[in-house]
């Protein structure tokens, strides 16, 4: 069954929503943007999070030392790396105990990446859906992100068969996380796939 990451969590009610809906991963954005939170906020939110839900820190070209400081403070279990990351940097994070997600645009997936997961994204926070049929089937753990909503995630899972799906703005209403949309998204993503349904 596909795993689900809800990203861009900022408030206690967001945490309550992912706890109730049964997300697998919760994303905290440390990179600049409208979802950015501080280490202190992340630690407070993590205390409210169900212990089975892993936390992912989202970074854009962040120095390894800064990522490790956030990990060592206890805020994250996984580092999601946008921008340029060298194999040495990824290995350094992994040796410290972090799992690593490396983010690529569809045309530029590096199958030799040292990361634990490869994420295919249509662009940071763009809300645009990828051309799903153009995503190559790969044997590496793959995360699908970008433009997913409760209305299209089931078809996306059927077409791409990713390890995980990742959503942020697709479960928001007026710029805030919507508990009903989070529940619907997770239910649709994890629904048993009937391949005859694929058109």
Swiss-Prot record:
Organism: Lacticaseibacillus casei (strain BL23) (Lactobacillus casei)
Keywords from the UniProt entry: Amino-acid biosynthesis, Aromatic amino acid biosynthesis, Isomerase, Tryptophan biosynthesis
Lineage per the UniProt record: Bacteria, Bacillati, Bacillota, Bacilli, Lactobacillales
Pathway where it operates: Amino-acid biosynthesis; L-tryptophan biosynthesis; L-tryptophan from chorismate: step 3/5
Gene Ontology terms, MF aspect: phosphoribosylanthranilate isomerase activity
InterPro entries: Aldolase_TIM, PRAI_dom, RibuloseP-bd_barrel, TrpF_fam
Catalyzed reactions per annotation: N-(5-phospho-beta-D-ribosyl)anthranilate = 1-(2-carboxyphenylamino)-1-deoxy-D-ribulose 5-phosphate
Enzyme Commission (EC) number: 5.3.1.24
Family in the record: Belongs to the TrpF family.
A Gene Ontology BP annotation from the UniProt entry: L-tryptophan biosynthetic process
UniProt xrefs under CDD domains: PRAI
UniProt gene name: trpF
Protein name per its UniProtKB record: N-(5'-phosphoribosyl)anthranilate isomerase
Organism domain of life: Bacteria
């Amino acid at each position: 069954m596909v795993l689900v990451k809800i990203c861009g969590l900022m408030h206690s009610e967001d945490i309550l929503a992912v706890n109730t809906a049964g997300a697998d991963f919760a994303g905290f954005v440390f990179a600049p943007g409208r979802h950015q939170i501080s280490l202190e906020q992340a630690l407070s939110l993590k205390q409210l999070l169900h212990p089975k839900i892993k936390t992912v820190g989202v970074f854009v070209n962040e120095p390894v030392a800064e990522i490790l400081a956030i990990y060592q403070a206890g805020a994250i279990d996984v580092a999601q790396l946008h921008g340029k990351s060298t194999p040495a940097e990824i290995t350094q994070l992994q040796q410290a105990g972090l799992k690593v997600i490396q983010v690529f645009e569809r045309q530029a997936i590096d199958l030799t990446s040292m990361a634990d997961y490869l994420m295919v994204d249509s662009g940071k926070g763009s809300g645009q859906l990828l051309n799903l049929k153009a995503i190559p089937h790969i044997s590496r753990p793959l995360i699908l992100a970008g433009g997913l909503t409760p209305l299209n995630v089931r078809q996306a899972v059927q077409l791409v068969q990713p390890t995980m799906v990742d959503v942020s703005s697709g479960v928001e209403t007026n710029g805030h996380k919507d508990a009903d949309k989070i529940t619907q998204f997770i239910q649709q993503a994890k629904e048993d796939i009937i391949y005859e349904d694929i058109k």
